C-alpha cells in the first residue's frame, strides 16, 4: 500500500485529551479515530485502544514522558492528538510542552462528575496556556436521569469558570466513547458532534512565522573584514537583510543593530524564517558585545527580566532527579533557550519543601536578566543535570 502524502491543504491543529484517571480519555481517543475512519475511510486510519495505551516514551527538556500521538482529519482540518497514559505524564507533558496543545478535550465521566485530577488538569491548562477547552461528558449511556446529567454539566461549567475559562459558553457534548468504539451508530453520531464542536470552538493557532522575529543566540564568530556573526535557529517570525534588530538579555542594557547579511549553509539569503538555522551578520557589533543566551529580536517585542512566577515539575529519583527535597532559597540553574542562569527560589505560602516528583508553583529571582514573556519554558539544572522543568506563568520584574 502506498504511503499517503501529508496534504498541506487543510489547517493543522494540535489537541489532546485531559481529565481524571479512568474517565475514558484513551477510550475516547480511540473512538474518535474509529468514528472518523467510518465517516472518511480514505482520510483516517482507525487506531485501536491498546495501541494508544502503550504510549512510547519521549524526552522533553531532559524528562521522560509516555505520550501517544494520533492523527486524524475532519472535513475542515488535520489534527494531531496527544493522549498520556498516566496522570504524572500529563503533568509533565503540560509543563514541559513536549506536545503543545492549541486546545483540549476535557473528558469528565457523567457517573462521577469532576474529580481531583479534573481540577488539576484544568488549573494546569490555565497556567501553561492551553487556550481553549471543549468538554466530552463521557459514559452518558450509564446515566438514565436527565437531571443528574444536567447537574454534572453545571458542575463542569462552574469548575471551568473558576479557572477563568468561559464556562457558560464552552461546548459540553454528551458521549459514550465505549459504545461508539463498539460501533453504536447513535453514540458514533455524538462523537461527530463533538468533533464539529472542536472544529468550531478551537481556533487555528497563529503560526510561528506570523509572530514577531526572535532567534536565541547559540554561537558568536568573527569573520575578518566583515564583522560579527551570530548563529542560531529562528524560533519565530522572519528576519530580512537591512532590518533593525535588538539584542536582549544577560547584559543590563539592550543593544540595537542592523542585520547586514543572512547566511544558511554558507549561502547568502534575503531572509531567515522560523525553523531555519542561520548566521546573522551584525553591523558595528564586536565579538565581546554578544553572547550565547541572548536573543536577537524585532525591536520592542520582548524585554529582559529577573523575577517571575512559574509552575514547575520536579523529577523524582527514578527519573534521574534529586534524591532529597529542597527548601526556600534553593539556588539551582535555570536553563532558558540556550543558557543557564542561577536563580533563587521562593516557595508559596504554606509550602515548607518540595519533594522529588512534586509539581509546584514558585517565584524565582535570577542573577542575570533573560528575555522573557509569559509562557516561556525552562529546565532546572544542577551541575548540568536536569532536575526539573517549568514554565513562566507571570513576569514580575
Curated annotation (Swiss-Prot):
Residues 138-141 are annotated as: G4. Disulfide bonds: none annotated. Residues 19-26 are annotated as: G1. It catalyses: GTP + H2O = GDP + phosphate + H(+). It is found in: Cytoplasm. It holds the Pfam family GTP_EFTU_D3. Its main location: cytoplasm. Residues 176-178 are annotated as: G5. Keywords: Cytoplasm, Elongation factor, GTP-binding, Hydrolase, Magnesium, Metal-binding, Nucleotide-binding, Protein biosynthesis. InterPro entries: EF-Tu_GTP-bd, EF-Tu_GTPase, EFTu-like_2, EFTU_2, G_TR_CS, P-loop_NTPase, Small_GTP-bd, T_Tr_GTP-bd_dom. Residues 10-206 form the tr-type G domain. GTP binds at residues 19-26, 83-87, 138-141. Its EC number is 3.6.5.3. The keyword Cytoplasm applies. GO terms for cellular component: cytosol. It is an enzyme of class 3 (hydrolase). GO terms for molecular function: GTP binding; GTPase activity; translation elongation factor activity. Mg(2+) binds at residue 26. Residues 83-86 are annotated as: G3. Monomer. GTP hydrolase that promotes the GTP-dependent binding of aminoacyl-tRNA to the A-site of ribosomes during protein biosynthesis. Belongs to the TRAFAC class translation factor GTPase superfamily. Classic translation factor GTPase family. EF-Tu/EF-1A subfamily. This is Elongation factor Tu.
Amino acid at each position: 500500500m502506498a504511503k499517503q502524502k501529508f496534504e498541506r491543504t487543510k489547517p493543522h491543529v494540535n489537541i489532546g485529551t485531559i481529565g481524571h484517571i479512568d474517565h475514558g480519555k484513551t477510550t475516547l481517543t480511540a473512538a474518535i479515530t474509529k468514528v472518523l475512519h467510518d465517516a472518511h475511510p480514505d482520510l483516517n486510519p482507525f487506531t485501536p485502544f491498546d495501541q494508544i495505551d502503550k504510549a512510547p516514551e519521549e524526552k522533553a527538556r531532559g524528562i521522560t514522558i509516555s505520550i501517544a500521538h494520533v492523527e486524524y482529519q475532519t472535513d475542515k482540518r488535520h489534527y494531531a492528538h496527544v493522549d498520556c497514559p498516566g496522570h504524572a505524564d500529563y503533568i509533565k507533558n503540560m509543563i514541559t510542552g513536549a506536545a503543545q496543545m492549541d486546545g483540549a478535550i476535557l473528558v469528565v465521566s457523567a457517573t462521577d462528575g469532576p474529580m481531583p485530577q479534573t481540577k488539576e488538569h484544568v488549573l494546569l491548562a490555565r497556567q501553561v496556556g492551553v487556550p481553549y477547552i471543549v468538554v466530552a461528558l463521557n459514559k452518558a449511556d450509564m446515566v438514565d436521569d436527565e437531571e443528574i446529567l444536567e447537574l454534572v454539566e453545571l458542575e463542569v461549567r462552574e469548575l471551568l469558570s473558576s479557572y477563568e475559562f468561559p464556562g457558560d459558553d464552552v461546548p459540553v457534548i454528551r458521549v459514550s466513547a465505549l459504545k461508539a468504539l463498539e460501533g453504536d451508530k447513535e453514540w458514533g453520531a455524538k462523537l461527530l458532534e463533538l468533533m464539529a464542536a472542536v472544529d468550531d470552538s478551537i481556533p487555528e493557532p497563529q503560526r510561528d512565522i506570523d509572530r514577531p522575529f526572535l532567534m536565541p543566540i547559540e554561537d558568536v564568530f568573527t569573520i575578518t573584514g566583515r564583522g560579527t556573526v551570530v548563529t542560531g535557529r529562528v524560533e519565530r517570525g522572519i528576519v530580512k537583510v537591512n532590518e533593525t534588530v535588538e539584542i536582549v538579555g544577560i547584559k543590563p542594557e539592550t543593544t540595537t543593530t542592523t542585520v547586514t547579511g543572512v547566511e544558511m549553509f554558507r549561502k547568502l539569503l534575503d531572509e531567515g524564517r522560523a525553523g531555519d538555522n542561520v548566521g546573522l551578520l551584525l553591523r558595528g557589533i564586536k565579538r565581546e558585545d554578544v553572547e550565547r543566551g541572548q536573543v536577537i529580536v524585532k525591536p520592542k517585542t520582548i524585554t529582559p527580566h529577573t523575577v517571575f512566577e512559574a509552575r514547575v515539575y520536579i523529577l523524582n529519583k527514578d527519573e534521574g532527579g534529586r534524591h532529597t527535597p529542597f527548601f526556600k532559597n534553593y539556588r539551582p540553574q535555570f536553563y532558558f533557550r540556550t543558557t543557564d542562569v542561577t536563580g533563587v527560589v521562593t516557595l508559596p505560602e504554606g509550602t515548607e519543601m518540595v519533594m522529588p516528583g512534586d509539581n509546584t508553583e514558585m517565584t524565582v529571582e535570577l542573577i542575570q536578566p533573560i528575555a522573557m514573556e509569559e509562557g516561556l519554558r525552562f529546565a532546572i539544572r544542577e551541575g548540568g543535570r536536569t532536575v526539573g522543568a517549568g514554565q513562566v506563568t507571570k513576569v514580575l520584574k
